[in-house]
């Protein structure tokens, strides 16, 4: 009788999992490592790192980067990158990240009329009327590819520098592209250099009270924060890693069930609820979308111990960020403020910690809506809508699995079949 080679069910089940793990690991993008091979892109690479965009891209798995070589940085462009506030500079750089892998063949198929491609700036939630997209066109006679924005003249693609299907393509362009909504005349308030060797005082903190006043629909949250005194504590925590604040809108407080009365809570518990809305790290909206560890500690966690008062942050429907408190499921509805080291986001629900509000009471959690109305920053106009990025208009090789992965997958299936 022929010898039968046995193989455990665990091994059979583990092989597909390991292959999936390897494929997802390979899909992660390290844009700094990619650009390090090109010394002429050092200035652009440094901007991506210092602004935090390089880290933001690590969670993406398919994009095209529009990089400006050192030789193409005019004095005006360099001056612009130095003058812009950090949040505006970050949005400027997000506009140079196309959320679509474009191969050389994809570029050749672009029609003369052009194709709209979504940028990472669109995912920030601060764009309006399609201002987060660029129009990519190709001249059929010369073969040159240009990329346009309503706010500035078109830039020309100089070269397809690097392509790693289906993850990243690096295109060099002859100038920076400025998106609509960024004031190129804006500048940071620069302090003169000290005249003595004594240490200068630390910079003034960001005024959270004024941010919430400017947001127009955070009146209830503001009154609770001021009355409890924790808003001062939040402002003191801006230093170091920074903070991310999730502020319920006024309608979120109106939607609280009748058995939840925050005003009746003891002062200490009320402070815990408010601190439960704050992460002790600075996150942009894009970094929340690509967060690798969904369970995040809050300021309340620091007081009550590891594992308690945590939030579960995830992304659904492409670009909608949800926050699960263990009792309610809230959605990020707007970016009220984003300037390193502080970001403030409006949320659709009051985040109730399970430690204080067990689910045994009236159910509060609801499914996230298909579309979430967003209030524009500091505006009383009709809110725009945060939706998933539009479907890819240019056909892309990004939808195809890597050939090597398919061959490896088929080989493993055949190998297991022979062994069994």
Curated annotation (Swiss-Prot):
Cell membrane as UniProt keyword? yes
The family database entries (InterPro entries) matched by this protein are listed as: FAS1_dom_sf, FAS1_domain, Plant_FLA
Glycosylation site positions? 30, 40, 135, 154, 167, 207, 312, 317
Provide the propeptide boundaries. 397-420
**Lipid-linked residues (GPI-anchor amidated serine):** 396
Residues of the FAS1 domain: 29-177, 205-351
Gene Ontology CC: one annotated term: external side of plasma membrane
Please name the GO terms of the biological process aspect recorded for this protein, alphabetically: abscisic acid-activated signaling pathway; cell adhesion; mucilage biosynthetic process; mucilage biosynthetic process involved in seed coat development; multidimensional cell growth; response to salt stress
DNA-binding listed as a keyword: no
Give the subcellular location. Answer: Cell membrane
Expression induction = Up-regulated by abscisic acid, cold and drought treatments, but not by high salt.
Sequence ranges of Low complexity compositional bias? 368-384
Chain residue ranges for the region called Disordered = 360-388
Q: Please state the protein's primary subcellular location.
A: membrane
Kindly state the tissue distribution recorded for this protein.
Expressed in all plant organs and tissues, including guard cells in the leaf.
Record keywords: Cell membrane, Glycoprotein, GPI-anchor, Lipoprotein, Membrane, Proteoglycan, Repeat, Signal
Residues that span the membrane, as ranges: none
Q: Which residues form the signal peptide?
A: 1-28
According to the UniProt entry, its GO molecular function terms are: polysaccharide binding
- Protein name per the record: Fasciclin-like arabinogalactan protein 4
Instruction: Please tell me the species this chain comes from.
Output: Arabidopsis thaliana (Mouse-ear cress)
Lineage, highest ranks first: Eukaryota, Viridiplantae, Streptophyta, Embryophyta, Tracheophyta
């Amino acid at each position: 009788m022929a010898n039968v080679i046995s193989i455990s069910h665990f091994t059979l089940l583990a092989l597909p999992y390991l292959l999936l793990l390897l494929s997802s690991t390979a899909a992660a993008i390290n844009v700094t490592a990619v650009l390090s091979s090109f010394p002429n892109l050092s200035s652009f690479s440094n901007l991506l790192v210092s602004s935090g965009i390089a880290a933001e891209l690590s969670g993406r798995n398919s994009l095209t980067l529009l990089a400006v070589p050192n030789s193409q940085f005019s004095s005006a462009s360099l001056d612009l990158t130095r003058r812009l506030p950090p949040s505006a500079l970050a949005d400027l750089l997000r506009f140079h990240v196309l959320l679509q892998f474009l191969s050389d063949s994809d570029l050749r198929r672009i029609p003369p009329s052009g194709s709209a491609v979504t940028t990472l700036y669109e995912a920030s939630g601060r764009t309006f009327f399609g201002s987060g997209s660029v129009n990519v066109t190709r001249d059929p006679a010369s073969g040159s590819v240009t990329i346009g924005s309503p706010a500035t003249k078109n830039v020309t693609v100089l070269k397809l520098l690097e392509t790693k299907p289906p993850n990243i393509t690096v295109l060099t362009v002859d100038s920076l592209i400025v998106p609509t909504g960024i004031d190129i005349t804006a500048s940071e308030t620069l302090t003169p250099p000290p005249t003595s060797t004594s240490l200068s005082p630390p910079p003034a903190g960001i005024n959270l009270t004024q941010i919430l006043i400017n947001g127009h629909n955070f009146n209830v949250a503001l009154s609770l924060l001021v009355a409890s005194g924790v808003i001062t504590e939040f402002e003191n925590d801006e230093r170091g890693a920074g903070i991310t604040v999730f502020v319920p809108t006024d309608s979120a407080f109106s939607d609280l069930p009748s058995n939840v009365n925050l005003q009746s809570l003891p002062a200490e518990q009320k402070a815990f609820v408010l601190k439960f809305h704050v992460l002790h790290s600075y996150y942009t909206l894009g970094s929340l979308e690509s967060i690798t560890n969904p369970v995040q500690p809050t300021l309340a966690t620091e007081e009550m111990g590891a594992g308690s008062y945590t939030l579960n942050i995830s992304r659904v429907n492409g670009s909608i960020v949800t926050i699960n408190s263990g009792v309610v499921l809230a959605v990020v509805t707007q970016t009220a403020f984003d300037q390193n080291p502080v970001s403030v986001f409006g949320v659709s629900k009051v985040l109730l910690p399970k430690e204080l509000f067990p689910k045994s009471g009236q159910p509060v959690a609801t499914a996230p809506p298909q579309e979430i109305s967003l209030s524009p920053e500091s505006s009383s106009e009709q809110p725009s809508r945060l939706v998933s990025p539009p479907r890819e208009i240019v056909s892309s090789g990004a939808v195809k699995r890597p050939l090597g992965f398919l061959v490896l997958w088929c080989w493993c299936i055949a190998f297991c079949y022979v062994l069994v």
